[in-house]
């Protein structure tokens, strides 16, 4: 939250499974489209929040499987854990708040006699969350009985049912909605309330997000029955909540445009040749550079000299690139070598994407961008900590040039993708 000196232009708070992440999309296209949009347009002045029912263990597993961005804030375990930044620093104040009238041992003891409840794996059992599987046909009766039992014990607990099988018991003050309300209050107390907040979900444990006053909301097209039922009963007349006709992250992109919260055209949706922008935005230049790099190697742009010419037009004739292995090459020589790589990743589930992009202005017309550059092929991925220098150059066709690219390996991600980091 400290990355912004003032209010976020936009704060997106999104569920992960079947909302931000489409498990039926093997190419992860909608997720990558959102990532490119966020890094090119919003990363400098907005906040990205992931709100998931997953425990930290399963959340980290998902990040290894999918081309996800690093969020500014992560809400996990159905709103019982809040962490900040890449290091996932926990919010101790939130944990202390949840201890009120909560005794996990009593919850476990009082639910053991319900044969309909099957404990979820140990990784999903958290200090402020006890999680079970329950058949849909038994869910409502079990919820009622468990609630009565816990109430008699003097516990102030909440029961959330979602996904047609997941039953979570939490402190009454917990949940995705309460966690978001806590964050909004915390931002407001620092004088940084977001200008706009967009919440995004698909299942019952997301319903609370849509109940927070003033937020915009999108239920993705693949939203589950329990969330649609909640919407019909509680929010069908609220113009700030829509049911998208697009799946998962594509629905989030659609909602940004529907509510006029900002640009919603992803660099991945642009056709080459790119139109020259009216004003130069370094983040946009970096993201477009690597989107085109990926499309060249996947043979998703024509095999044309115009692509190689574009790369040379936006790179300095004397510029250099330093490979993670330490090899220093001319930028233009690297682009010439890229010409022979056209289509070498076609049909191989290859992707390249930018994460954690941060721009520093170093002069009146110069910038340095620092970011993680990921390349993946199937289940294998590599990552370099990258820096890229740009300067305005009015006489160049695009109005700017890249002068220097340098990469170093991210620990644990230094090998596996053949011919990685050509640029």
Curated annotation (Swiss-Prot):
Q: What domain of life does the native source organism fall in?
A: Eukaryota
Cofactor list: Mg(2+)
Question: What is known about its subunit structure?
Answer: Homodimer.
* PANTHER family, A to Z: SUCROSE-PHOSPHATASE 2-RELATED (PTHR46521:SF4)
Record keywords, A-Z: Hydrolase, Magnesium
Family matches, as InterPro entries = HAD-like_sf (IPR036412), HAD-SF_hydro_IIB (IPR006379), HAD_sf (IPR023214), NTF2-like_dom_sf (IPR032710), SPP-like_dom (IPR006380), SPP_C (IPR013679), Sucrose_Phosphatase (IPR051518), Sucrose_phosphatase_pln/cyn (IPR012847)
- Record EC number: 3.1.3.24
Q: Which gene encodes it?
A: SPP1
Which species is the source of this protein? Zea mays (Maize)
Entry keyword Ribosomal protein: no
Record-given protein name:
Sucrose-phosphatase 1
Which Pfam family would be a valid example here? S6PP
């Amino acid at each position: 939250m400290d990355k912004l000196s003032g209010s976020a232009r936009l704060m997106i708070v999104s569920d992960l499974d079947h909302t931000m992440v489409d498990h039926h999309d093997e190419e992860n296209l909608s997720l990558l489209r959102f990532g490119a949009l966020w890094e090119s347009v919003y990363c400098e002045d907005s906040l990205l929040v992931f709100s998931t029912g997953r425990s930290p263990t399963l959340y980290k597993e998902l990040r290894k499987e999918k081309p996800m961005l690093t969020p500014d804030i992560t809400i996990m375990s159905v709103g019982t854990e809040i962490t900040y930044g890449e290091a996932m620093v926990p919010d101790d104040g939130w944990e202390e708040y949840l201890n009120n009238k909560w005794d996990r041992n009593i919850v476990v003891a009082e639910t053991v006699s319900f044969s309909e409840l099957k404990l979820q794996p140990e990784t999903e059992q958290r200090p402020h969350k006890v999680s079970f599987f329950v058949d849909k046909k038994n869910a409502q009766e079990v919820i009622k009985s468990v609630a009565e039992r816990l109430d008699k014990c003097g516990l102030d607990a909440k029961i959330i049912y979602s996904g047609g099988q997941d039953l979570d018991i939490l402190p009454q003050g917990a949940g995705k909605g309460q966690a978001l309300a806590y964050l909004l209050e915390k931002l407001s107390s620092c004088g940084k309330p977001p200008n706009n907040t967009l919440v995004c979900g698909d299942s019952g444990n997301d319903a609370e997000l849509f109940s927070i006053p003033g937020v915009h909301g999108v239920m993705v097209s693949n939203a589950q029955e329990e969330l649609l039922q909640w919407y019909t009963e509680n929010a069908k007349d609220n113009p700030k909540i829509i049911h998208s006709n697009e799946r998962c992250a594509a629905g989030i992109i659609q909602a940004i445009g529907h509510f006029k919260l900002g640009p919603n055209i992803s660099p991945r949706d642009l056709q080459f040749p790119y139109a020259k922008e009216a004003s130069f935005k370094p983040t946009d230049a970096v993201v477009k550079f690597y989107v085109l790099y990926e499309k060249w190697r996947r043979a998703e742009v024509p095999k044309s000299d115009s692509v190689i010419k574009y790369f040379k037009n936006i790179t300095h004739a004397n510029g250099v690139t330093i490979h993670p292995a330490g090899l220093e090459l001319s930028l233009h020589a690297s682009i010439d070598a890229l010409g022979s790589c056209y289509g070498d990743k076609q049909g191989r589930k290859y992707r390249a994407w930018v994460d954690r992009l941060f721009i520093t202005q170093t002069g009146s017309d110069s910038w340095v961008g620092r970011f993680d550059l990921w390349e993946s092929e199937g289940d294998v991925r590599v990552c370099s900590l990258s820096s890229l220098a740009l300067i305005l150059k009015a006489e160049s066709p695009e109005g700017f040039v890249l002068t220097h690219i340098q990469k170093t390996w991210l620990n644990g991600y230094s090998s596996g993708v053949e011919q990685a980091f050509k640029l």
